[in-house]
């Protein structure tokens, strides 16, 4: 779930503040519900710039649900596909400098393992709502073979069967 992009920091201050308040509300409110429904929650992106209270809620949510084995919810927070690729490149560069890997070991598989998503499966389906017809810097590496579903509706108005009909 693409919850907050790296580009969102460039919105007007009042919008960013409103988004932070929404995060505080939903991260805290949904914590027990997601755990009770056996949902495992993880995050991708760089959460360091977020306020301390939001980082605490994120940590609580991921820690509480870490052993859940039901649905998997990955929250993209302060995430951008290009920034993720840069982070992966830096991780590999550091491993090369520290002689943990050799240049011969750098390939698509080792690169993918250094992305924020690591060993997570790539998405089979990406749903884009509200009339947008672009990926908007989301999972650029991982979406290479994903099905794309575009809807003019907002996410809250999409019936769960719509993407299922598309892919079946």
Where are these regions (language model features)?
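Short, charge-patterned binding micro-sites
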Residues: 2-20, 24, 30-55, 60-64
């Amino acid at each position: 779930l693409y919850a907050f992009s790296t580009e969102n920091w460039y919105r007007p201050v009042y919008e960013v503040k409103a988004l932070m308040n929404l995060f505080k509300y939903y991260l805290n409110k949904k914590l027990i519900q997601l755990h009770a429904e056996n949902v495992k929650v993880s995050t991708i992106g760089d959460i360091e710039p977020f306020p301390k209270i939001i980082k605490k809620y994120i940590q609580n949510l991921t820690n509480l649900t870490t052993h859940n084995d039901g649905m998997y919810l990955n929250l993209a927070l302060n995430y951008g596909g290009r920034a993720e690729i840069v982070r992966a490149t830096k991780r590999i560069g550091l491993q090369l400098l520290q002689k943990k890997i050799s240049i011969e070991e750098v390939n698509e598989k080792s690169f993918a393992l250094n992305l924020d998503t690591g060993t997570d499966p790539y998405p089979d389906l990406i749903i884009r709502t509200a009339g947008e017809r672009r990926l908007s810097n989301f999972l650029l590496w991982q979406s290479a073979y994903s099905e794309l579903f575009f809807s003019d509706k907002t996410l809250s108005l999409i019936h769960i069967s719509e993407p299922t009909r598309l892919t079946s």
